């Protein structure tokens, strides 16, 4: 589940990639953990009703081996929990009301560009490469894979498509784990299967969706005490749970109320955001300039942020002021926004639901 509109524009173009096979040494096991056979556990834990359960087992086993992930029950159940939550173990899940969502996005873009809707709808009545008109395909679209293919054809074949969308396909997530396509395009190294098409197309496959989704969930170092914080990061971005706790510490130390959303800087601008401005209020006590604060906040999307002087000093100030130890991990307070979501949901809700599924999986 993405915290953003799945039909928002991507920041990267899809690229053609030929991936060579590679594998890494497995991550070390934690104290008390036992290595398991990934494929056997997947077959055991997935419902018998799941189509191609053996293929899921093989793909996930290859994923763990090629990424060098620790083959533990917790890790396997974590991946399965996300896949169940996001797609109910479907490689290309149907999205209720997707046709309406797609038409609304097209109309919204036309309105923004001051193009009459009837002109756009007329242009979409021409035949597409599969013999049906674009309108017919949009009217019957059920999955994000189908919608992504429609937009690819529309952008490549129809001038109106290029006018509305440029060269960027607006479908942003896909596959059994609903992983970000932009994320996948940036993390192809070590992909164990040969791609016949684009990374975007691979994300919509069972194996690609699992591989990139697992990478996003497990393949980064974190100091978290429990899997639930990785589930929140899966939804909100790497280190969002750690960064939300840091924002809490900044708020305690500075007296400035902050949204604990995990975003330490404005990535779309060099202008300071609220967290950066609140941290600047502590500059004298921190013994840092505004530029030093900015440089260290920019490490907020990496593990190394925890080793910065800023991170350590902010906690020292906050804990001295409050007289108590403060958490280093918190579930971000983010409202989930997407045309696919019809209820009032948050990142914390998502993380808790997935964690419940993980716990049930481990008890089976």
UniProtKB/Swiss-Prot annotation:
GO cellular component term, pick one: cytosol
Family matches, as InterPro entries: DUF1615
- Give the matching Pfam families: DUF1615
Q: Which PROSITE patterns match?
A: PROKAR_LIPOPROTEIN
Source taxon at top rank: Bacteria
GO biological process terms held by the UniProt record: response to peptide
What's the protein name? Uncharacterized protein YaiW
Species the sequence originates in: Escherichia coli (strain K12)
The gene name on file is: yaiW
